[in-house]
Design a protein with these regions (language model features):
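Alpha-helical transmembrane segments and immediately membrane-proximal extracytoplasmic
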Residues: 1-222
Length: 222
């Protein structure tokens, strides 16, 4: 799982370098939020895990009651997570078209939403496996906490107006659960791979955008 917001920002910076119009205004804020997203997701998941566990244990529901709570909670938090995803991540790709004057906000949002649904139906399987099992195995309660932490974290940044990564938030939340259970439960190789991807993504995206800009400029403009 890598960050679309990092890829988009890296691509924009790459094009800005080629056009000699790079502005660093606001970039420091975005980078700080990139760092804060997984940390925030991690801390929030730990807090929610402990607080909700205490509340559930206090009422001591039956197995049937606990199962109902988990199923209902996963549906509700899943819908909230999808809402937060749409509120923040759709703008990562479609925002540049709105800024260039090609699309209205509503049209860009609609196209982005449909494209996200298409991506889910095609190539999301591998990312799901990495997040759901690759870092640490999640039970129903842990999954509920991860989705809720991810949704709250991403929603906060959407309100602020900063593009952040849902993948960073959810991985941070999963790490929080892993730390709570025990450090040995974490699969370090998967974690290193994820963090390496986060570091490399903006640079690779920037290089790709520079290359594409150079080729198209040479072919159609030069």
């Amino acid at each position: 799982p890598v960050s679309t917001s990092q890829a988009v920002v890296g691509s924009i910076v790459g094009v800005g370098i080629m056009q000699k119009q790079v502005t660093l205004t606001g970039l420091d804020k975005i980078i700080i939020c990139w760092i804060g997203t997984p940390i925030g997701g991690c801390i929030l998941s730990i807090i929610l895990y402990l607080v909700l566990a205490r509340i559930i244990n206090r009422f001591q529901p039956s197995w049937a009651g606990f199962d109902f709570i988990m199923r209902t909670g996963l549906i509700i938090t899943g819908c909230y997570g999808a809402y937060a995803l749409g509120a923040n991540n759709v703008a990562n790709v479609t925002g540049v078209f709105y800024g260039a004057g090609f699309l209205s906000i509503k049209t860009a949002a609609l196209i982005g939403g449909v494209s996200i649904a298409l991506g889910i139906l095609t190539f999301s399987k591998g990312v799901m496996k990495t997040v759901g099992r690759g870092i640490v195995k999640l039970d129903a309660y842990s999954a509920l906490i991860v989705v809720l932490s991810n949704a709250i974290t991403v929603h906060i940044y959407a309100v602020i107006g900063v593009p952040v990564s849902t993948s960073q938030a959810v991985v941070g939340a999963v790490l929080g659960i892993g730390l709570l259970k025990r450090a040995e439960a974490l699969r370090k190789r998967a974690i290193v791979g994820v963090f390496s991807g986060w570091i490399a993504t903006p640079f690779i995206a920037g290089l790709v955008s520079i290359s594409i800009y150079f080729v198209t400029h040479l072919t159609y403009v030069g």
